[in-house]
């Protein structure tokens, strides 16, 4: 049912895109296309309330119904294991869709276009490449989890089984801090855009956005978030395809590829980009873009490797689908920021959209470009797309925090003999508590003047030091608890020292520590890089001094299921060691090769050559973006339906049998 409704949603959004063709000329005639964006003046405030409350309620009802139908017709039993692991039987397509959705934050849609507006074509590329390789490489850890801890509910259970309570508590702090940072970014971006387009009170928006998410997550747990991920991702891809079609193939205002090229060349002549070759927007030779790329690359390792949401997707996936799901998800996700920002971020530049520095930092480039180009239709589409991203990624964070508190706090320290019913009750209580607290956190950050852009760049400073210790704990037999714990803690303080020290040393800020000096690219760069390198060095060198006698089989003995289930037994039957080793080797080769291409082989020759795109190369660049997002849409929309065909037909047969029984018809 949910997948059929998702297809209808795709059709509806596509029809809205077609209707946009006629709206562009009328918007132009009305003066909508004039390069000006007025905060809060694009849409009526009632539209904001409809999206935040009305659309949230619709998705909460639809997704809850889908979960109830699965329970009724597929015999799904709602236990604490099922609630937090989705039965460990999710297939490749839905795993990939869930990864794409969980990794599509407000920042994916907003910050990627911000750096396009600031640095030109290099911004979208470095955002996409610098944030997709983590997912590609995480596939290695995901399959190692399947091999070494098939019964795990969280990655922290593995740390405790190997290193004990002290290390477990340290990494629990890092994990919860990661969830808070990601949640804050989601709501900062979402509330800012709702306020910027409709004038709805930003604090009220921040409080209301999580409510619908909270409802369907309460009903269906992790499986509900997977269903929501799929449906929301369809809408996001449909909106992006509509923008691409409008800018490059339909709109007379942008003039297609040739028109965009001419406008971007003219924009660079009027306002050259400092640090870019020839001041051009159409070049990868951008110092600012490269610095952002490094910060982005380092910072995002923390928000994947230290975020329970991604470990939870690895836990929920079938062992045979884990690596394929992460590799496919990573490559499909690349298309979202790369194509959207290459399209809408550069459209804002081409049309001369004027934004204040504060509006840029709030991430309002995409809504401004869509509003100026397409009027109210564009604004509504951006608002809908952003709401989909915030709520789907938000649901992933909700269930992640729920699992951490349930299994790593309550079951570990409060009630080791807890029953499944007790754990389920705790899980739901945490969802309500964290769901209500999410908005409060965003309001606090807004009140002290922190924007989406600032929090996005600072996250690696705060959590990057835990990345390598966690990765080595899962993959390296010689890692010891003292080195891993010290690496995470000392790395954090070293990162903070480098961050603050650089901010003080920058002469343009007069030696004052402020949001402006801390938000400078060089302050962020040194803080992010210091954290991950110091944490990794202490863990690596500290572990070399002592040979470990640890056996991986000890982990699986220490981590047990709360309840046995048919889903769990299916997962165990899929747990063939030879198959998992082949998957591990494939993840090393596939993830490693794609990382080298995206970080070195593709961008660096273009950077060092100083090449400025001509119209032909720009057309090729746009063509790659269009083909990539179209292919990604095909896989993310189509593959889950293909893989779910047997379940769909089973539901249809049982519904038909029930209907025939009710009407007294003989089979």
Briefly describe each language-model feature range.
Residues 2-667:
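Membrane-embedded helix-loop-helix hairpins and adjacent transmembrane boundary segments
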């Amino acid at each position: 049912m949910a997948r059929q409704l998702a297809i209808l949603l795709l059709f509806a959004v596509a029809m809205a895109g077609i209707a946009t063709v006629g709206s562009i000329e009328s918007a132009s005639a009305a003066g909508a296309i004039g390069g000006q964006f007025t905060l809060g003046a694009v849409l009526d405030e009632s539209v904001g309330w409809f999206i935040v409350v009305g659309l949230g309620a619709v998705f909460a009802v639809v997704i809850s119904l889908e979960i109830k139908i699965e329970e009724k017709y597929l015999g799904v039993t709602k236990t604490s294991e099922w609630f937090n692991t989705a039965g460990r039987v999710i297939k490749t397509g839905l795993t990939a869709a869930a990864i794409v959705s969980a990794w599509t934050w407000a920042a994916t849609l907003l910050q990627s276009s911000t750096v396009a507006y600031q640095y030109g074509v290099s911004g979208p590329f470095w955002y996409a490449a610098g944030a997709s390789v983590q997912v590609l490489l995480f596939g290695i850890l995901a399959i190692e989890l399947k091999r070494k801890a098939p019964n795990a509910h969280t990655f922290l259970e593995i740390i405790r089984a190997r290193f004990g309570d002290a290390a477990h508590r340290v990494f629990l702090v890092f994990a919860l801090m990661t969830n808070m940072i990601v949640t804050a970014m989601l709501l900062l971006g979402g509330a800012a855009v709702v306020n910027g387009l409709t004038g709805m009170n930003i604090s009220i928006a921040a409080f209301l956005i999580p409510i619908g998410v909270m409802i369907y997550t309460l009903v269906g747990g992790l499986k509900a978030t997977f269903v929501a991920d799929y449906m929301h991702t369809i809408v996001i891809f449909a909106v992006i395809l509509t923008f691409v079609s409008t800018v490059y193939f339909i709109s007379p205002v942008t003039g297609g590829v040739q028109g965009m090229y001419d406008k971007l060349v003219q924009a660079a002549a009027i306002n050259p980009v400092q640090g870019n070759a020839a001041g051009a927007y159409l070049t990868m030779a951008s110092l600012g873009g490269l610095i952002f790329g490094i910060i982005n690359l380092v910072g995002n390792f923390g928000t994947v490797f230290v975020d329970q949401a991604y470990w939870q997707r690895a836990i929920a996936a079938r062992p045979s689908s884990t690596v394929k799901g992460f590799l496919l998800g990573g490559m499909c996700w690349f298309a979202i920021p790369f194509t959207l920002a290459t399209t809408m971020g550069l459209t804002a530049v081409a049309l001369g959209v004027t934004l204040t520095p504060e509006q840029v930092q709030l991430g309002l480039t995409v809504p401004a470009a869509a509003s100026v180009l397409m009027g109210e239709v564009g604004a509504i589409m951006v608002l809908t797309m952003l709401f989909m991203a915030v709520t789907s990624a938000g649901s992933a964070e909700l269930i992640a925090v729920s699992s951490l508190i349930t299994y790593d706090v309550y079951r570990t320290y409060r009630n080791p003999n807890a029953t499944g019913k007790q754990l389920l009750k705790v899980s739901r209580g945490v969802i309500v508590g964290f769901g209500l607290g999410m908005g409060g956190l965003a309001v606090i950050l807004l009140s002290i003047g922190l924007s989406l852009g600032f929090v996005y760049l600072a996250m690696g400073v705060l959590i990057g030091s835990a990345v390598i210790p966690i990765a080595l704990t899962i993959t390296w037999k010689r890692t010891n608890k003292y080195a891993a714990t010290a690496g995470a803690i000392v790395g954090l303080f070293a990162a903070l020292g480098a961050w603050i020290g650089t901010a003080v040393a920058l002469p343009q800020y007069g030696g004052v520590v402020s949001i402006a000096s801390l938000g400078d690219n060089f302050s962020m760069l040194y803080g992010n890089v210091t954290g991950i390198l110091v944490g990794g060095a202490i863990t690596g060198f500290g572990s070399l001094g002592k040979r470990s006698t640890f056996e991986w089989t000890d982990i699986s003995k220490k981590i047990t299921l709360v309840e046995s289930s048919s889903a769990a037994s299916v997962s165990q039957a899929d747990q063939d060691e030879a198959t998992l080793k082949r998957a591990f080797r494939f993840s090393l080769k596939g993830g490693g090769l794609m990382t080298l291409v995206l970080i070195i082989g593709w961008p660096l020759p273009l950077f060092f050559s100083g090449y400025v795109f001509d119209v032909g190369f720009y057309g090729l660049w746009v063509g790659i973006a269009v083909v990539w997002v179209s292919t990604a849409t095909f896989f993310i929309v189509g593959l889950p339906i293909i893989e779910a065909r047997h379940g769909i037909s089973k539901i249809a047969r049982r519904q038909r049998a029930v209907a025939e029984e009710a009407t007294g018809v003989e089979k």
